[in-house]
Protein backbone atom coordinates (compact mmCIF):
# COMPACT_ATOMS: atom_id res chain seq x y z
CA UNK A 1 0.00 0.00 0.00
CA UNK A 2 1.41 3.36 -1.04
CA UNK A 3 1.70 5.72 1.91
CA UNK A 4 1.18 9.47 1.63
CA UNK A 5 3.97 12.04 1.73
CA UNK A 6 2.40 13.44 4.91
CA UNK A 7 2.84 10.10 6.63
CA UNK A 8 6.30 9.38 5.21
CA UNK A 9 7.64 12.78 6.34
CA UNK A 10 6.95 11.90 9.98
CA UNK A 11 7.65 8.19 9.92
CA UNK A 12 9.35 6.92 13.11
CA UNK A 13 9.08 10.35 14.79
CA UNK A 14 6.75 9.46 17.64
CA UNK A 15 8.17 11.90 20.20
CA UNK A 16 8.27 14.82 17.75
CA UNK A 17 4.68 14.21 16.66
CA UNK A 18 3.47 13.82 20.24
CA UNK A 19 5.04 17.12 21.34
CA UNK A 20 3.80 18.98 18.25
CA UNK A 21 0.26 17.68 18.84
CA UNK A 22 0.30 18.71 22.51
CA UNK A 23 1.42 22.22 21.53
CA UNK A 24 -1.15 22.56 18.73
CA UNK A 25 -4.17 21.53 20.82
CA UNK A 26 -2.96 23.22 24.01
CA UNK A 27 -2.03 26.74 22.97
CA UNK A 28 -5.46 28.26 22.16
CA UNK A 29 -7.36 27.05 25.28
CA UNK A 30 -4.50 28.33 27.49
CA UNK A 31 -4.55 31.73 25.77
CA UNK A 32 -8.33 31.97 26.13
CA UNK A 33 -8.17 31.00 29.81
CA UNK A 34 -5.78 33.83 30.70
CA UNK A 35 -7.42 36.39 28.38
CA UNK A 36 -10.83 35.74 29.95
CA UNK A 37 -9.33 36.42 33.38
CA UNK A 38 -8.68 40.05 32.39
CA UNK A 39 -12.34 40.86 31.76
CA UNK A 40 -14.52 42.26 34.57
CA UNK A 41 -17.89 42.08 32.79
CA UNK A 42 -18.54 45.83 33.11
CA UNK A 43 -19.05 47.75 29.88
CA UNK A 44 -21.77 48.76 27.51
CA UNK A 45 -23.56 45.64 28.73
CA UNK A 46 -23.18 44.17 32.22
CA UNK A 47 -21.91 40.59 31.85
CA UNK A 48 -22.37 38.21 34.77
CA UNK A 49 -18.90 37.39 36.12
CA UNK A 50 -20.04 33.81 36.68
CA UNK A 51 -20.55 33.49 32.92
CA UNK A 52 -16.94 34.54 32.36
CA UNK A 53 -15.78 32.01 34.96
CA UNK A 54 -17.86 29.35 33.22
CA UNK A 55 -16.13 30.12 29.92
CA UNK A 56 -12.78 29.92 31.68
CA UNK A 57 -13.73 26.47 32.94
CA UNK A 58 -14.87 25.48 29.44
CA UNK A 59 -11.48 26.51 28.06
CA UNK A 60 -9.86 24.19 30.63
CA UNK A 61 -12.19 21.36 29.63
CA UNK A 62 -11.31 21.96 25.97
CA UNK A 63 -7.63 21.95 26.90
CA UNK A 64 -8.13 18.60 28.62
CA UNK A 65 -9.99 17.21 25.59
CA UNK A 66 -7.33 18.45 23.18
CA UNK A 67 -4.43 17.03 25.19
CA UNK A 68 -6.32 13.77 25.74
CA UNK A 69 -6.32 13.10 21.97
CA UNK A 70 -2.53 12.63 21.49
CA UNK A 71 -2.22 11.03 24.94
CA UNK A 72 -4.92 8.47 24.10
CA UNK A 73 -3.15 7.66 20.81
CA UNK A 74 0.13 7.12 22.63
CA UNK A 75 -1.40 4.94 25.34
CA UNK A 76 -3.45 2.96 22.79
CA UNK A 77 -0.38 2.13 20.75
CA UNK A 78 1.47 0.99 23.87
CA UNK A 79 -1.49 -1.04 25.14
CA UNK A 80 -2.33 -2.83 21.88
CA UNK A 81 1.21 -3.82 20.94
CA UNK A 82 0.95 -6.29 18.04
CA UNK A 83 -2.17 -8.00 19.39
CA UNK A 84 -4.54 -8.12 16.41
CA UNK A 85 -7.67 -8.52 18.56
CA UNK A 86 -6.82 -5.45 20.64
CA UNK A 87 -5.95 -3.43 17.54
CA UNK A 88 -9.16 -4.53 15.78
CA UNK A 89 -11.33 -3.43 18.71
CA UNK A 90 -9.51 -0.27 19.81
CA UNK A 91 -8.44 1.33 16.51
CA UNK A 92 -12.00 2.02 15.18
CA UNK A 93 -13.03 3.56 18.53
CA UNK A 94 -9.84 5.60 18.73
CA UNK A 95 -10.26 6.88 15.17
CA UNK A 96 -13.81 8.07 15.88
CA UNK A 97 -12.66 9.70 19.12
CA UNK A 98 -9.93 11.61 17.27
CA UNK A 99 -12.27 12.73 14.45
CA UNK A 100 -15.25 13.83 16.53
CA UNK A 101 -13.11 14.98 19.45
CA UNK A 102 -11.29 17.40 17.14
CA UNK A 103 -14.54 18.63 15.57
CA UNK A 104 -15.97 19.32 19.04
CA UNK A 105 -12.69 20.94 20.08
CA UNK A 106 -12.71 23.29 17.06
CA UNK A 107 -16.39 24.19 17.54
CA UNK A 108 -15.77 25.04 21.22
CA UNK A 109 -12.68 27.12 20.39
CA UNK A 110 -14.69 29.15 17.85
CA UNK A 111 -17.45 29.81 20.41
CA UNK A 112 -14.95 30.86 23.10
CA UNK A 113 -13.22 33.19 20.63
CA UNK A 114 -16.52 34.88 19.73
CA UNK A 115 -17.29 35.36 23.44
CA UNK A 116 -13.80 36.78 24.11
CA UNK A 117 -14.12 39.17 21.22
CA UNK A 118 -17.54 40.32 22.40
CA UNK A 119 -16.10 41.01 25.88
CA UNK A 120 -13.25 42.93 24.27
CA UNK A 121 -15.64 45.19 22.34
CA UNK A 122 -18.00 45.52 25.30
CA UNK A 123 -15.44 46.55 27.92
CA UNK A 124 -12.74 48.37 26.03
CA UNK A 125 -14.54 49.94 23.13
CA UNK A 126 -18.10 50.49 24.34
CA UNK A 127 -19.63 48.92 21.28
CA UNK A 128 -19.10 52.05 19.12
CA UNK A 129 -19.91 51.58 15.45
CA UNK A 130 -16.32 52.03 14.24
CA UNK A 131 -15.03 49.43 16.66
CA UNK A 132 -17.84 47.06 15.77
CA UNK A 133 -16.67 47.35 12.16
CA UNK A 134 -13.09 46.65 13.19
CA UNK A 135 -14.25 43.75 15.31
CA UNK A 136 -16.28 42.35 12.43
CA UNK A 137 -13.21 42.57 10.17
CA UNK A 138 -11.09 40.74 12.72
CA UNK A 139 -13.81 38.15 13.17
CA UNK A 140 -13.92 37.58 9.43
CA UNK A 141 -10.15 37.15 9.45
CA UNK A 142 -10.52 34.61 12.24
CA UNK A 143 -13.17 32.71 10.32
CA UNK A 144 -10.85 32.73 7.32
CA UNK A 145 -8.43 30.76 9.46
CA UNK A 146 -10.88 28.25 10.89
CA UNK A 147 -12.60 26.84 7.76
CA UNK A 148 -9.34 25.24 6.53
CA UNK A 149 -8.82 23.78 10.00
CA UNK A 150 -12.35 22.38 10.11
CA UNK A 151 -11.98 21.16 6.53
CA UNK A 152 -8.79 19.33 7.43
CA UNK A 153 -10.61 17.45 10.20
CA UNK A 154 -13.91 17.03 8.35
CA UNK A 155 -12.16 15.31 5.43
CA UNK A 156 -11.65 12.32 7.71
CA UNK A 157 -15.37 11.96 8.45
CA UNK A 158 -16.10 11.13 4.81
CA UNK A 159 -16.36 7.55 3.61
CA UNK A 160 -15.47 7.35 -0.07
CA UNK A 161 -16.70 4.16 -1.64
CA UNK A 162 -14.85 3.75 -4.92
CA UNK A 163 -16.40 0.84 -6.81
CA UNK A 164 -14.27 -1.93 -8.26
CA UNK A 165 -14.60 -2.30 -12.03
CA UNK A 166 -15.30 -5.96 -12.65
CA UNK A 167 -17.81 -8.76 -13.15
CA UNK A 168 -19.43 -10.71 -10.34
CA UNK A 169 -19.71 -14.37 -11.32
CA UNK A 170 -22.63 -16.68 -10.58
CA UNK A 171 -22.41 -20.38 -9.72
CA UNK A 172 -24.71 -21.51 -12.51
CA UNK A 173 -22.63 -20.11 -15.39
CA UNK A 174 -19.21 -20.41 -13.74
CA UNK A 175 -19.40 -23.68 -11.84
CA UNK A 176 -15.77 -24.63 -12.60
CA UNK A 177 -14.15 -21.71 -10.78
CA UNK A 178 -16.65 -21.94 -7.89
CA UNK A 179 -15.88 -25.65 -7.59
CA UNK A 180 -12.12 -24.97 -7.49
CA UNK A 181 -12.53 -22.29 -4.81
CA UNK A 182 -14.90 -24.50 -2.79
CA UNK A 183 -12.49 -27.46 -2.87
CA UNK A 184 -9.59 -25.23 -1.83
CA UNK A 185 -11.62 -23.73 1.03
CA UNK A 186 -12.28 -27.22 2.39
CA UNK A 187 -8.69 -28.31 1.83
CA UNK A 188 -7.13 -25.50 3.87
CA UNK A 189 -10.10 -25.18 6.28
CA UNK A 190 -10.88 -21.59 5.27
CA UNK A 191 -14.22 -19.86 4.81
CA UNK A 192 -15.71 -20.17 1.33
CA UNK A 193 -16.24 -16.69 -0.16
CA UNK A 194 -19.81 -15.94 -1.16
CA UNK A 195 -18.76 -13.84 -4.14
CA UNK A 196 -16.13 -14.17 -6.87
CA UNK A 197 -15.27 -11.10 -8.95
CA UNK A 198 -13.14 -10.92 -12.10
CA UNK A 199 -11.39 -7.66 -12.96
CA UNK A 200 -8.96 -6.22 -15.51
CA UNK A 201 -6.10 -5.55 -13.12
CA UNK A 202 -3.22 -7.58 -11.72
CA UNK A 203 -4.73 -7.75 -8.25
CA UNK A 204 -5.78 -10.79 -6.27
CA UNK A 205 -7.42 -10.10 -2.93
CA UNK A 206 -9.92 -11.44 -0.42
CA UNK A 207 -12.12 -9.01 1.47
CA UNK A 208 -14.63 -9.50 4.29
CA UNK A 209 -16.60 -6.26 3.95
CA UNK A 210 -19.17 -4.89 1.53
CA UNK A 211 -17.71 -4.28 -1.92
CA UNK A 212 -19.22 -2.13 -4.66
CA UNK A 213 -18.70 -3.56 -8.14
CA UNK A 214 -19.37 -1.70 -11.41
CA UNK A 215 -19.62 -3.78 -14.59
CA UNK A 216 -20.19 -0.88 -16.98
CA UNK A 217 -23.98 -1.03 -16.75
CA UNK A 218 -24.93 -1.62 -13.12
CA UNK A 219 -23.29 -1.04 -9.78
CA UNK A 220 -24.00 -3.70 -7.17
CA UNK A 221 -22.98 -4.05 -3.56
CA UNK A 222 -21.65 -7.48 -2.68
CA UNK A 223 -22.16 -8.59 0.92
CA UNK A 224 -20.00 -10.93 3.01
CA UNK A 225 -16.70 -12.40 1.76
CA UNK A 226 -15.51 -11.65 -1.76
CA UNK A 227 -12.60 -13.10 -3.73
CA UNK A 228 -11.22 -10.84 -6.47
CA UNK A 229 -9.35 -12.56 -9.31
CA UNK A 230 -7.14 -10.95 -11.95
CA UNK A 231 -8.25 -11.81 -15.49
CA UNK A 232 -4.89 -10.91 -17.10
CA UNK A 233 -3.10 -13.29 -14.73
CA UNK A 234 -5.56 -16.06 -15.58
CA UNK A 235 -3.88 -15.96 -18.99
CA UNK A 236 -0.37 -16.64 -17.66
CA UNK A 237 -1.02 -18.90 -14.66
CA UNK A 238 -1.51 -22.64 -14.89
CA UNK A 239 -4.46 -24.11 -13.00
CA UNK A 240 -2.23 -25.40 -10.18
CA UNK A 241 -0.51 -22.02 -9.91
CA UNK A 242 -3.88 -20.27 -9.72
CA UNK A 243 -4.94 -22.68 -6.98
CA UNK A 244 -1.88 -21.63 -5.00
CA UNK A 245 -2.67 -17.91 -5.37
CA UNK A 246 -6.33 -18.47 -4.44
CA UNK A 247 -5.25 -20.62 -1.48
CA UNK A 248 -3.06 -17.76 -0.30
CA UNK A 249 -5.97 -15.30 -0.48
CA UNK A 250 -8.39 -17.72 1.22
CA UNK A 251 -5.82 -18.05 4.00
CA UNK A 252 -6.75 -14.49 4.98
CA UNK A 253 -10.28 -15.71 5.80
CA UNK A 254 -8.84 -17.97 8.48
CA UNK A 255 -8.94 -17.19 12.21
CA UNK A 256 -7.91 -13.77 13.48
CA UNK A 257 -7.18 -12.45 10.00
CA UNK A 258 -10.92 -12.17 9.26
CA UNK A 259 -11.68 -9.99 12.32
CA UNK A 260 -8.58 -7.89 11.68
CA UNK A 261 -9.52 -7.45 8.00
CA UNK A 262 -13.09 -6.42 8.85
CA UNK A 263 -12.45 -4.00 11.72
CA UNK A 264 -8.97 -2.55 11.27
CA UNK A 265 -7.89 -2.76 7.64
CA UNK A 266 -10.80 -0.82 6.01
CA UNK A 267 -10.45 2.15 8.40
CA UNK A 268 -6.67 2.14 8.09
CA UNK A 269 -6.92 2.15 4.28
CA UNK A 270 -9.53 4.92 4.43
CA UNK A 271 -7.23 7.13 6.49
CA UNK A 272 -4.42 6.55 4.01
CA UNK A 273 -6.71 7.37 1.07
CA UNK A 274 -7.60 10.69 2.74
CA UNK A 275 -3.90 11.44 3.24
CA UNK A 276 -3.19 10.66 -0.43
CA UNK A 277 -6.03 13.01 -1.42
CA UNK A 278 -4.57 15.71 0.84
CA UNK A 279 -1.18 15.21 -0.83
CA UNK A 280 -2.78 16.10 -4.17
CA UNK A 281 -4.65 19.06 -2.64
CA UNK A 282 -1.45 20.39 -1.07
CA UNK A 283 0.37 20.14 -4.40
CA UNK A 284 -2.45 22.08 -6.10
CA UNK A 285 -2.38 24.74 -3.36
CA UNK A 286 1.39 25.08 -3.71
CA UNK A 287 1.06 25.71 -7.44
CA UNK A 288 -1.82 28.14 -6.94
CA UNK A 289 -0.57 30.13 -3.93
CA UNK A 290 3.17 29.34 -4.06
CA UNK A 291 3.09 28.25 -0.40
CA UNK A 292 2.20 25.32 1.87
CA UNK A 293 -1.41 25.17 3.20
CA UNK A 294 -0.16 25.19 6.79
CA UNK A 295 -3.58 25.65 8.40
CA UNK A 296 -4.92 22.37 7.03
CA UNK A 297 -1.64 20.68 7.96
CA UNK A 298 -2.04 21.84 11.56
CA UNK A 299 -5.52 20.30 11.68
CA UNK A 300 -4.37 16.89 10.45
CA UNK A 301 -1.36 16.48 12.75
CA UNK A 302 -3.36 14.33 15.21
CA UNK A 303 -4.38 12.06 12.31
CA UNK A 304 -0.77 11.79 11.17
CA UNK A 305 0.17 10.77 14.71
CA UNK A 306 -2.66 8.21 14.85
CA UNK A 307 -1.90 6.78 11.42
CA UNK A 308 1.85 6.56 11.85
CA UNK A 309 1.66 4.84 15.22
CA UNK A 310 -0.53 2.10 13.79
CA UNK A 311 1.15 1.94 10.36
CA UNK A 312 4.27 0.48 12.00
CA UNK A 313 2.11 -2.22 13.59
CA UNK A 314 0.31 -2.81 10.29
CA UNK A 315 3.60 -3.33 8.44
CA UNK A 316 4.77 -6.01 10.85
CA UNK A 317 1.40 -7.74 11.16
CA UNK A 318 0.87 -7.62 7.39
CA UNK A 319 4.22 -9.29 6.73
CA UNK A 320 3.40 -11.99 9.29
CA UNK A 321 -0.04 -12.51 7.69
CA UNK A 322 1.38 -12.75 4.19
CA UNK A 323 4.03 -15.30 5.13
CA UNK A 324 1.40 -17.33 6.97
CA UNK A 325 -0.98 -17.14 3.98
CA UNK A 326 1.87 -18.27 1.70
CA UNK A 327 1.86 -21.61 3.53
CA UNK A 328 -1.83 -22.00 2.73
CA UNK A 329 -0.96 -21.19 -0.89
CA UNK A 330 1.77 -23.83 -0.96
CA UNK A 331 -0.65 -26.42 0.48
CA UNK A 332 -3.32 -25.47 -2.06
CA UNK A 333 -0.99 -25.87 -5.05
CA UNK A 334 0.42 -29.14 -3.59
CA UNK A 335 3.98 -27.86 -3.92
CA UNK A 336 5.95 -24.93 -2.56
CA UNK A 337 7.86 -24.85 -5.85
CA UNK A 338 4.64 -24.44 -7.85
CA UNK A 339 3.40 -21.69 -5.53
CA UNK A 340 6.71 -19.79 -5.68
CA UNK A 341 6.66 -20.11 -9.48
CA UNK A 342 3.19 -18.52 -9.42
CA UNK A 343 4.42 -15.70 -7.19
CA UNK A 344 7.46 -15.23 -9.44
CA UNK A 345 5.17 -14.79 -12.41
CA UNK A 346 3.19 -12.12 -10.53
CA UNK A 347 6.36 -10.19 -9.76
CA UNK A 348 7.76 -10.42 -13.31
CA UNK A 349 4.62 -9.94 -15.39
CA UNK A 350 3.43 -7.01 -13.28
CA UNK A 351 6.12 -4.96 -15.06
CA UNK A 352 4.58 -5.90 -18.41
CA UNK A 353 1.10 -4.99 -17.18
CA UNK A 354 2.27 -1.48 -16.30
CA UNK A 355 3.63 -1.06 -19.83
CA UNK A 356 0.40 -2.43 -21.37
CA UNK A 357 -1.77 -0.18 -19.20
CA UNK A 358 0.24 2.92 -20.09
CA UNK A 359 -0.02 2.07 -23.79
CA UNK A 360 -3.79 1.64 -23.40
CA UNK A 361 -4.12 5.03 -21.67
CA UNK A 362 -2.04 6.72 -24.36
CA UNK A 363 -4.23 5.26 -27.13
CA UNK A 364 -7.36 6.55 -25.40
CA UNK A 365 -5.81 9.94 -24.62
CA UNK A 366 -4.44 10.50 -28.14
CA UNK A 367 -7.59 9.04 -29.75
CA UNK A 368 -5.55 6.62 -31.85
CA UNK A 369 -7.64 4.58 -34.29
CA UNK A 370 -6.02 1.20 -33.58
CA UNK A 371 -7.80 0.65 -30.28
CA UNK A 372 -7.07 -2.24 -27.93
CA UNK A 373 -10.15 -4.47 -27.98
CA UNK A 374 -8.98 -6.98 -25.37
CA UNK A 375 -6.62 -5.55 -22.75
CA UNK A 376 -5.92 -8.97 -21.27
CA UNK A 377 -4.80 -10.53 -24.56
CA UNK A 378 -2.79 -7.38 -25.34
CA UNK A 379 -1.01 -7.95 -22.03
CA UNK A 380 -0.05 -11.50 -23.10
CA UNK A 381 1.15 -10.27 -26.52
CA UNK A 382 3.23 -7.52 -24.89
CA UNK A 383 4.74 -10.06 -22.48
CA UNK A 384 5.86 -12.25 -25.35
CA UNK A 385 7.40 -9.25 -27.13
CA UNK A 386 9.16 -7.64 -24.17
CA UNK A 387 10.29 -10.58 -22.08
CA UNK A 388 13.11 -12.70 -23.40
CA UNK A 389 12.28 -16.29 -22.50
CA UNK A 390 15.82 -17.26 -21.59
CA UNK A 391 16.33 -14.21 -19.34
CA UNK A 392 13.30 -14.40 -17.04
CA UNK A 393 15.46 -15.84 -14.24
CA UNK A 394 17.70 -12.76 -14.53
CA UNK A 395 14.68 -10.49 -14.13
CA UNK A 396 13.53 -12.57 -11.18
CA UNK A 397 16.88 -12.30 -9.39
CA UNK A 398 16.69 -8.52 -9.74
CA UNK A 399 13.12 -8.51 -8.42
CA UNK A 400 13.60 -10.78 -5.42
CA UNK A 401 14.13 -7.82 -3.04
CA UNK A 402 11.19 -5.85 -4.41
CA UNK A 403 8.12 -5.39 -2.18
CA UNK A 404 5.05 -5.94 -4.32
CA UNK A 405 2.32 -3.31 -3.95
CA UNK A 406 -1.15 -4.61 -3.17
CA UNK A 407 -4.49 -2.80 -2.69
CA UNK A 408 -4.57 -3.41 1.05
CA UNK A 409 -0.94 -3.96 2.03
CA UNK A 410 2.61 -4.43 0.84
CA UNK A 411 3.66 -7.98 0.16
CA UNK A 412 7.07 -9.01 1.52
CA UNK A 413 10.05 -9.27 -0.85
CA UNK A 414 10.11 -12.48 -2.87
CA UNK A 415 13.37 -13.51 -1.19
CA UNK A 416 11.64 -13.57 2.23
CA UNK A 417 8.73 -15.57 0.83
CA UNK A 418 11.06 -18.13 -0.73
CA UNK A 419 12.98 -18.54 2.54
CA UNK A 420 9.71 -18.91 4.43
CA UNK A 421 8.77 -21.92 2.26
CA UNK A 422 12.28 -23.32 1.93
CA UNK A 423 12.48 -22.80 -1.84
CA UNK A 424 15.77 -21.84 -3.49
CA UNK A 425 16.11 -19.76 -6.64
CA UNK A 426 17.58 -22.76 -8.47
CA UNK A 427 14.18 -24.48 -8.25
CA UNK A 428 12.62 -21.87 -10.54
CA UNK A 429 13.28 -22.40 -14.25
CA UNK A 430 12.84 -20.19 -17.31
CA UNK A 431 10.66 -22.94 -18.77
CA UNK A 432 8.20 -22.82 -15.85
CA UNK A 433 8.00 -19.01 -16.03
CA UNK A 434 6.85 -19.07 -19.67
CA UNK A 435 4.58 -22.10 -19.35
CA UNK A 436 0.92 -21.03 -19.34
CA UNK A 437 -0.66 -24.48 -19.77
CA UNK A 438 -3.00 -25.90 -18.66
CA UNK A 439 -4.32 -22.35 -18.62
CA UNK A 440 -6.40 -21.19 -15.68
CA UNK A 441 -8.37 -19.09 -18.20
CA UNK A 442 -10.05 -22.36 -19.21
CA UNK A 443 -11.96 -22.27 -15.90
CA UNK A 444 -13.98 -19.25 -17.11
CA UNK A 445 -16.50 -19.82 -19.96
CA UNK A 446 -16.61 -16.97 -22.50
CA UNK A 447 -13.62 -15.27 -20.89
CA UNK A 448 -12.89 -13.38 -24.13
CA UNK A 449 -16.32 -11.73 -23.99
CA UNK A 450 -15.81 -10.68 -20.35
CA UNK A 451 -12.37 -9.24 -21.18
CA UNK A 452 -13.67 -7.31 -24.20
CA UNK A 453 -16.61 -5.84 -22.27
CA UNK A 454 -14.40 -4.75 -19.38
CA UNK A 455 -11.90 -3.25 -21.85
CA UNK A 456 -14.75 -1.11 -23.24
CA UNK A 457 -15.69 -0.03 -19.69
CA UNK A 458 -12.09 0.95 -18.85
CA UNK A 459 -11.86 2.78 -22.18
CA UNK A 460 -14.94 4.87 -21.35
CA UNK A 461 -13.70 5.58 -17.81
CA UNK A 462 -10.33 6.71 -19.19
CA UNK A 463 -12.04 8.98 -21.75
CA UNK A 464 -14.20 10.52 -19.03
CA UNK A 465 -11.17 11.19 -16.81
CA UNK A 466 -9.30 12.82 -19.70
CA UNK A 467 -12.24 15.10 -20.48
CA UNK A 468 -12.92 16.14 -16.88
Predicted regions: what is each one?
Residues 136, 140, 167-171, 232, ...:
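Short, charged/polar micro-motifs that form catalytic or ligand-binding hotspots
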Residues 152-262, 266:
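Peri-catalytic and regulatory segments of divalent metal-dependent proteins
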Residues 76-92, 269-272, 276-283, 307-324, ...:
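Hydrophobic topogenic segments
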Residues 1-206, 350, 427-435, 444-468:
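Hydrophobic or amphipathic, alpha-helical segments that drive membrane association/targeting
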Residues 209-222, 267-308, 366-370:
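Short, flexible helix-coil linker/hinge segments at the edges of structured domains or between repeats
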Residues 1-67, 287-318, 323, 327, ...:
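Cytosolic-facing loops and C-terminal tails of multi-pass membrane proteins
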Residues 2-19, 80-99, 232-264, 322, ...:
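Membrane-interface, cytosolic juxtamembrane amphipathic helix immediately N-terminal to a transmembrane helix
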Residues 255-289, 339-347, 428:
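Post-HEXXH active-site segment of zinc metalloproteases
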Amino acid sequence: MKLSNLSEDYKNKTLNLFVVNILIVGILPIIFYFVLGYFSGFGFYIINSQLILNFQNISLYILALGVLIPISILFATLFTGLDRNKISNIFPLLTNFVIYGLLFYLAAVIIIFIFCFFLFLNELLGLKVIFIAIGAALSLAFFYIFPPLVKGVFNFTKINYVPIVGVSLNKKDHSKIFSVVSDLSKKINAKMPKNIVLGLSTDFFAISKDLKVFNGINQTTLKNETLYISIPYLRILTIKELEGIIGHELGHFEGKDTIYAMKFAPIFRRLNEHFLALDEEFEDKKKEFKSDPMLIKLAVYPFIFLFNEFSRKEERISKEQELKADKFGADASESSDVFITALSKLYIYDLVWEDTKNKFKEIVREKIKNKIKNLSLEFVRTARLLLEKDKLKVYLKNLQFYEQLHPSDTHPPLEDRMKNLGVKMEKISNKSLVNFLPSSASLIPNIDLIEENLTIVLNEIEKFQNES
